[in-house]
């Protein structure tokens, strides 16, 4: 039996970022399908944790439309508190507490179904996120960055290396990745459809990247390797299945991985997100249950079955090799 923190000897502590004690301003960079859906989730669900949602996009007409329409939303009795939605200029973007990266240089067409489409976006999105992170550091940004674009885990590492290259004091926990929440959600979906996977919703866990290398465990108390591998495969392939049906899935990722997980992060609640796991020799942003506390990031401490730990070790080492 082992713990997930055993993957790294002498890990760098995650103690720069702590749970906020007041409402935050969350700024979204790029208002495409994912960014716009994320805005809806944060607006409707985040009023207790967020006072303002800043939005930026290359299209000023889209910014105007979203700002205007969201400001026209109210309940009859004004009984609910909604964040203010505010259009931002590029120079204003990093004036906030949380900067959310939703930009993508390209999204593969629907007829591309041969492999993980997330990795198709890596090289071009890497350039985007590096430039974005450098701009944040240069602007004196004092908050933290949330990466939602694909591939989340690798883009987190790219953003961190870019930020650290400009400011050696930049902590790795000031960048977090949001892609694992929907993989957990898909695991729950299949657990309701097939009794073989029924234990997942209450006993299971998701780990690692949200594409190749994903690790789902049917149960952490009654772990079954064969069932877990089958469930993992179904969840990994769900994206391709959707594309074969003629649509690009973005609603569940934007809400489950994005809005709900970011709100839970701000609230200090357990959430699925990718956090830095590494030392001076090797490192990766690795998805797992974690939460923000007064002293930094706490990862879930589970005594893992040997078979599950070996899968996590393989996934982690592969991420380290990729970047």
Per-region residue spans from a language model:
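Long, compositionally biased stretches enriched for glycine and/or charged residues
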Residues: 191-323
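Short helix-capping segments at alpha-helix termini
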Residues: 46-48, 74-78, 164-173
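Conserved N-terminal Rossmann-fold NAD(P) cofactor-binding segment
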Residues: 2-5, 9, 56-96
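Conserved active-site and cofactor/substrate-binding residues in soluble primary-metabolism enzymes
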Residues: 33, 37, 61, 124-127, ...
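NAD(P)+-binding Rossmann beta1-loop-alpha1 motif at the extreme N-terminus of oxidoreductases
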Residues: 2-65
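Rossmann-like dinucleotide-binding core of oxidoreductases
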Residues: 144-222
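Rossmann-like NAD(P)-binding element
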Residues: 81-144
């Amino acid at each position: 039996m082992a713990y997930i923190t055993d993957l790294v000897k002498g890990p760098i502590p995650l103690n720069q970022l702590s749970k906020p004690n007041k409402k935050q301003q969350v700024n979204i960079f790029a208002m495409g399908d994912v960014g716009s859906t994320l805005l809806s989730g944060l607006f409707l669900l985040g009023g207790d944790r967020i006072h303002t949602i800043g939005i930026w996009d290359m299209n000023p007409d889209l910014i105007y439309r979203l700002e205007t329409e969201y400001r026209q939303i109210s309940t009859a009795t004004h009984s609910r508190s909604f964040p203010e939605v505010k259009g931002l200029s590029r120079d204003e973007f990093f004036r906030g507490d949380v900067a959310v990266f939703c930009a993508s240089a390209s999204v593969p067409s629907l007829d591309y179904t041969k492999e993980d489409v997330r990795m198709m976006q890596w090289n071009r999105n890497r350039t985007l996120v590096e430039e974005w992170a450098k701009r944040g550091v240069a602007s004196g940004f004092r908050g933290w960055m949330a990466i939602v674009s694909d591939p989340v885990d690798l883009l987190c590492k790219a953003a961190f290396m870019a930020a650290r290259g400009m400011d050696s004091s930049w902590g790795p926990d000031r960048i977090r990745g949001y892609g694992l929440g929907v993989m957990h959600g898909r695991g729950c979906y299949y657990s309701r459809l097939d009794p073989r996977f029924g234990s997942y919703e209450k006993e299971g866990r998701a780990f690692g990247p949200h594409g190749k290398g994903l690790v789902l465990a049917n149960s952490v108390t009654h772990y079954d390797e064969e069932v877990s591998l089958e469930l993992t495969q179904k969840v990994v392939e769900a994206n391709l299945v959707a594309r074969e049906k003629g649509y690009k899935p973005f609603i569940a990722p934007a809400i489950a991985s994005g809005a709900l997980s970011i709100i839970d992060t701000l609230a200090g609640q357990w959430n699925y997100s990718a956090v830095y796991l590494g030392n001076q020799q090797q490192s990766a942003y690795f998805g797992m249950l974690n939460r923000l506390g007064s002293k930094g990031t706490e990862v879930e401490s589970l005594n893992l079955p040997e078979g599950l730990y070996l899968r996590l070790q393989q996934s982690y080492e592969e991420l380290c090799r990729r970047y």
